[in-house]
Amino acid sequence: MLNVNEYFAGKVKSIGFEGDGIGRASVGVMDAGEYTFGTGQPEEMTVITGALKVLLPGAPDWQVFTPGETFFVPGKSEFNLQVVEPTSYLCKYL
């Protein structure tokens, strides 16, 4: 079953799904902007197109992730994103 979600007045949209070999995950697109997301459980985020500038919990500096690059977010935390251009991603819930 697919679950469609929309955040930040429609600037971020995702489709959640569950599949063999991947488990629970979502794919989505973020429009340009700045966002803060909270996590319930650990997440693995992979950029598909575009780029994400990310400030992870406890990190002193922002990091830029481009297509094919992955970052991990601890559960029960918040992380900040700066998005310059429309960017697609895959999020796996660990």
Swiss-Prot record:
The keyword Glycosyltransferase applies. One of its GO terms (molecular function) is thymidine phosphorylase activity. It is an enzyme of class 2 (transferase). It holds the Pfam family Ppnp. Its EC number is 2.4.2.1, 2.4.2.2. It catalyses: a purine D-ribonucleoside + phosphate = a purine nucleobase + alpha-D-ribose 1-phosphate; adenosine + phosphate = alpha-D-ribose 1-phosphate + adenine; cytidine + phosphate = cytosine + alpha-D-ribose 1-phosphate; guanosine + phosphate = alpha-D-ribose 1-phosphate + guanine. One of its GO terms (cellular component) is cytosol. Keywords: Glycosyltransferase, Transferase. The keyword Disulfide bond does not apply. NCBIfam families: PRK10579.1. Belongs to the nucleoside phosphorylase PpnP family. HAMAP family: Nucleos_phosphorylase_PpnP. Catalyzes the phosphorolysis of diverse nucleosides, yielding D-ribose 1-phosphate and the respective free bases. Can use uridine, adenosine, guanosine, cytidine, thymidine, inosine and xanthosine as substrates. Also catalyzes the reverse reactions. This is Pyrimidine/purine nucleoside phosphorylase. It comes from Pectobacterium carotovorum subsp. carotovorum (strain PC1). The gene is ppnP.
